[in-house]
Amino acid sequence: MVKAVCVINGDAKGTVFFEQETSEAPVKVTGEVLGLAKGLHGFHVHEFGDNTNGCMSSGPHFNPRNKEHGAPTDENRHLGDLGNIQAAGDSPTAVSITDSKITLFGADSIIGRTVVVHADADDLGKGGHELSKTTGNAGARIGCGVIGIAKI
């Protein structure tokens, strides 16, 4: 069992927890984010755990296999593509994701990388915009934090 935690700061704030029983098991992602406008917001793991220049230093989506951007259910997607979270607009936004592509184990572990919450909806690579296949055209980075190992 490996557990990790991410404290998100910026215009969006919150805490997100990651838990994986074994290297073969899916990762459970839970938590809540505050400060989001009503609607969908892109939710991704970015390549670097560097927030020295705010969320912009975190680099592109974590993509060690050089795939195009896609939906969490797509075979062809960045490892860091976790889709969208749905905000009601006036209350904390719950995060509840189970993903079988990200991992907390080995060379492709997301520990030490950055979670980024975006201002707009992720079009899941299907929007036809020039950014659809790289970022999901999800807009500005409004909150982020580095994923760290948590006490079990």
UniProtKB/Swiss-Prot annotation:
Binding site for Zn(2+): 61, 69, 78, 81
Subunit structure: Homodimer.
Reported function: Destroys radicals which are normally produced within the cells and which are toxic to biological systems.
Protein name: Superoxide dismutase [Cu-Zn]
PROSITE patterns: SOD_CU_ZN_1, SOD_CU_ZN_2
Gene that encodes it: Sod1
Family named by the database record: Belongs to the Cu-Zn superoxide dismutase family.
Catalytic activity: 2 superoxide + 2 H(+) = H2O2 + O2
Record's signal peptide: none
Binding site for Cu cation: 44, 46, 61, 118
The enzyme's E.C. designation: 1.15.1.1
Obligatory cofactor(s): Cu cation; Zn(2+)
Organism: Drosophila pseudoobscura pseudoobscura (Fruit fly)
Any one GO CC term of the record: cytoplasm
GO molecular function, one term: copper ion binding
